[in-house]
């Protein structure tokens, strides 16, 4: 194989490698975004549950007749 053809093949490999890296980075960013959204959703649910339990506790602690 002559040197120009070898250079061209190397450029193609580098281009494919660049595209693969970009795809991996994009997939990683999407995963992080999805995980972050799931964490926020879970946090919201847990906060609501905690508030409900606190309200129930307050009701139980009030003396009857109030």
Swiss-Prot record:
Changing residue 32 to E: Decreased VASH1 tyrosine carboxypeptidase activity on alpha-tubulin. One of its GO terms (biological process) is negative regulation of endothelial cell migration. Changing residue 40 to F: No effect on VASH1 tyrosine carboxypeptidase activity on alpha-tubulin. Residues 5-52 form a coiled coil. Changing residue 39 to E: No effect on VASH1 tyrosine carboxypeptidase activity on alpha-tubulin. Pfam families: CCDC23. Residues 1-31 are annotated as: Disordered. It is found in: Cytoplasm; Secreted; Cytoplasm, Cytoskeleton. GO terms for molecular function: microtubule binding; peptidase activator activity. Changing residue 47 to D: Decreased VASH1 tyrosine carboxypeptidase activity on alpha-tubulin. Keywords: Coiled coil, Cytoplasm, Cytoskeleton, Disease variant, Intellectual disability, Secreted. GO terms for cellular component: apical part of cell; cytoplasm; cytoskeleton; extracellular region. InterPro entries: SVBP (IPR031378). It is linked to Neurodevelopmental disorder with ataxia, hypotonia, and microcephaly: An autosomal recessive neurodevelopmental disorder characterized by intellectual disability, microcephaly, ataxia, and muscular hypotonia. PANTHER family: SMALL VASOHIBIN-BINDING PROTEIN (PTHR34762:SF1). Belongs to the SVBP family. Interacts with VASH1 and VASH2. Enhances the tyrosine carboxypeptidase activity of VASH1 and VASH2, thereby promoting the removal of the C-terminal tyrosine residue of alpha-tubulin. This activity is critical for spindle function and accurate chromosome segregation during mitosis since microtubule detyronisation regulates mitotic spindle length and postioning. Also required to enhance the solubility and secretion of VASH1 and VASH2. Plays a role in axon and excitatory synapse formation. This is Small vasohibin-binding protein. It comes from Homo sapiens.
């Amino acid at each position: 194989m002559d040197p120009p053809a070898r250079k061209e093949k190397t450029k193609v490999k580098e281009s494919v490698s660049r595209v693969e890296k970009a795809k991996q980075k994009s997939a990683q960013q999407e995963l992080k975004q999805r995980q972050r959204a799931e964490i926020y959703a879970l946090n919201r649910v847990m906060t609501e549950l905690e508030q409900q339990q606190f309200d129930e506790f307050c009701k139980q602690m009030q003396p009857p007749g109030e």
